């Protein structure tokens, strides 16, 4: 919604700041006195007549320590509310990747992002993202097409926001509002037919560390 686009930096990039709305009921917004937030900076560019989008290079500066790394046949997990998940992998035609975000230990709260190449579908399931009843929990879908090559995936989580960048071709953004203080668990699981090249979870800097 109403993105702000700038092209005035020395690299002559088109830098976009999107607007992320929470989508909950109006009466629940009034006590807060605010609504919506801006996305991380994104760069849009043309490559072989295709419009691509990726996080601005400066977002790498937010990375602090690595909280988890993927090992073959194991689940990658880490705790945190400000994280970046970086994956580079080679899928097959039926591969499935499941990424659980901001989950409580008992699973009462959880947001689940699934990449299902057999169904050509990206799916963000927010149905259990919060225990609150006045928050939008609609599912978000986007189509994908299997290609026999490696894929890059980056996911940014910042407390109530999730921003997903799929292979520089597609973005998916959403708001979530976990109500439990222990909803800080994040994990990545992949089917056996996925060849994982890179898998890491980073803690992102808070405002006092920038």
What are these regions (language model features)?
Residues 1-210:
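Beta-rich accessory regions
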């Amino acid at each position: 919604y109403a993105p702000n686009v700038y092209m005035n930096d020395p690299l002559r990039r088109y830098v976009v700041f999107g607007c992320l709305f929470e989508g909950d009921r109006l009466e629940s917004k009034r006590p807060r006195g605010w609504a919506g937030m801006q996305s991380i900076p994104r760069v849009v560019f043309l490559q072989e007549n295709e419009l691509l989008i990726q996080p601005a290079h400066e977002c790498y500066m937010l990375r602090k320590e690595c909280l988890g790394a993927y090992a073959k046949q194991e689940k990658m997990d880490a705790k945190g509310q400000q994280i970046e998940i970086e994956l580079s992998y080679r899928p097959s035609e039926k591969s499935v990747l499941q990424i659980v975000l901001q989950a409580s230990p008992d699973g009462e709260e959880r947001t689940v992002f699934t990449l299902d190449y057999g169904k050509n579908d990206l799916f963000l399931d927010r149905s259990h993202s919060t225990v609150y009843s006045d928050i939008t929990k609609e599912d978000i879908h986007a189509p994908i097409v299997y290609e026999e090559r490696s894929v890059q995936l980056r996911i940014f989580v910042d407390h109530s926001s999730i921003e997903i960048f799929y292979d520089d071709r597609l973005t998916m953004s959403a708001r979530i509002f976990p109500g439990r203080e222990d909803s800080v668990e994040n994990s990545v699981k992949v089917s056996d037919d996925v060849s994982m090249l890179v898998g890491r979870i980073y803690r992102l800097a808070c405002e006092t560390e920038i």
